[in-house]
Amino acid sequence: MGREFLGLFEEWADSYDQSVEGYDEEYREVFANYEDILNTVASKAGSVVLEFGVGTGNLTKKLLEQGKTVYGIEPSEPMRKKAREKLGDKVLIVDGDFLQFPLPPKPIDTIVSTYAFHHLTDEEKGEAIAKYSQLLKKGDKIVFADTAFRDRQAFQRAIEEARERGFHHLADDLGREYYTTLDVLTKLFKENGFTVTFTQKNAFVWVMEAVKQ
């Protein structure tokens, strides 16, 4: 369910914001256009939002600035602490993950996440989308931004290019976690009653907007 990677992200809590700001050369392209990615997800969201993988609260902050109600889910206590330092008491952030989480206290119209859905296997992604379909009504949305690839060949090329550039942490990350392809995501959303569109934001990250039918 993604929690097998929790230790890595608890170690990353103190330096995550430096990484997204481009100070980590290996991940610079992964986080290229980061502000635009956050703004795009926030602007596509409705008024009452469930956010998975809050992290240090960067997307949450954008959502709040746009006047949205946000219920945050984050499995890492160090990350929750960082988010609370950034956001104060403006938002409720609770322990949970993509598959096991407390239900929000009021109906939601959008589920969002950035840079996190790849912690789930493709099978778990399908389970998660099925759960979310039960929480959403017709016209409601799932808006995720995450690393994904057009096809398996593009995925393999990305790993090979990272190795060639000496970006071994990035290459290991791409090989270790559960990054997927657009055709797999399209199938999973369609099977659970969504239409989905994809917009590429950098060499790695796509914004996926799935609308409940």
Swiss-Prot record:
Residues that coordinate or bind S-adenosyl-L-methionine: 53, 74, 97
Signal peptide: none
EC number annotated for this UniProt entry: 2.1.1.-
Enzyme type, top EC level: transferase
Keywords recorded for this protein, A-Z: Methyltransferase, S-adenosyl-L-methionine, Transferase
InterPro entries in alphabetical order: Methyltransf_25, rRNA_Ade_methylase_Trfase_N, SAM-dependent_MTases_sf, Uncharacterised_MeTfrase_YrrT
GO MF: rRNA (adenine-N6,N6-)-dimethyltransferase activity
Role description: Could be a S-adenosyl-L-methionine-dependent methyltransferase.
PANTHER family: TRANS-ACONITATE 2-METHYLTRANSFERASE, TRANS-ACONITATE 2-METHYLTRANSFERASE-RELATED
Family according to the record: Belongs to the methyltransferase superfamily. YrrT family.
The protein's name in its UniProt record: Uncharacterized methyltransferase GWCH70_2477
Organism: Geobacillus sp. (strain WCH70)
